[in-house]
């Protein structure tokens, strides 16, 4: 499915396809590629910077061996827990098929942050390394991952904010439909978004830039 996203005040238009390519008949999404790219860059740079924090670079890869699987479960679990009604059948029981269907979307970075802290605490305890030093280094990785990863939200046309008429407002049919279905705009507002007169805050971009600023501050 192609989503057309425009920034009327900036004269920009993007044609976005969530699917990058197909592999063995299965779609490979840009979101996953971008998230994985952010994670790999974070691991690479943190490995380079590790000696500054008194951390052995190999410890980062060892920790990631446990942190990544835990995060894959936690990002979905966090989203499901806080949106449980979306995964209930008509009789009130949980639809485990829908819960386990990652391809339908529904992930929350907060779950990965929580699980990573827990894994890091256990890892540092077992390996007898400083949790605070590792956490200081980990913050750099978090900023890098989020800086890049938020562009996955752009490819999915999600994680946008409230309505606005600012020059950098973001517009699109899928955005207008979401706002109308969620009750954030009425029919007039829906048509205004379609026309480009009204848009939404590109919060994915805001957060990406905040993480870039955060990385400069802690580096």
Per-range role (PLM):
Residues 1-219:
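A feature for loop-to-transmembrane-helix boundaries and adjacent hydrophobic helices
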């Amino acid at each position: 499915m192609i989503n057309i996203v425009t920034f009327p005040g900036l004269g920009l238009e993007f044609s976005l396809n969530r699917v990058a390519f197909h592999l063995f008949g299965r779609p490979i999404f840009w979101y996953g590629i971008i998230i994985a790219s952010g994670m790999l860059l974070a691991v690479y740079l943190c490995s380079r910077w590790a000696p500054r924090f008194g951390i052995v670079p190999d410890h980062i890869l060892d920790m990631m061996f446990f942190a990544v699987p835990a995060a894959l479960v936690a990002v979905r679990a966090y989203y499901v827990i806080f949106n449980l009604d979306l995964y209930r059948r008509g009789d009130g029981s949980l639809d485990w098929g829908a819960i386990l269907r990652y391809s339908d979307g529904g992930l929350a970075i907060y779950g990965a942050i929580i699980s990573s802290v827990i894994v890091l605490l256990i890892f540092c305890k077992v390996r007898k390394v400083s949790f605070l030093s590792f956490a200081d280094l980990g913050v750099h990785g978090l900023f890098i991952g989020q800086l890049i990863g938020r562009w996955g939200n752009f490819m999915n046309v999600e994680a946008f904010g409230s309505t606005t008429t600012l020059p950098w407002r973001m517009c699109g049919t899928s955005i207008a439909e979401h706002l109308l279905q969620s009750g954030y705009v009425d029919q007039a507002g829906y048509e205004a978004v379609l026309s480009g007169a009204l848009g939404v805050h590109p919060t994915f971009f805001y957060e990406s830039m905040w993480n870039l600023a955060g990385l400069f501050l802690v580096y």
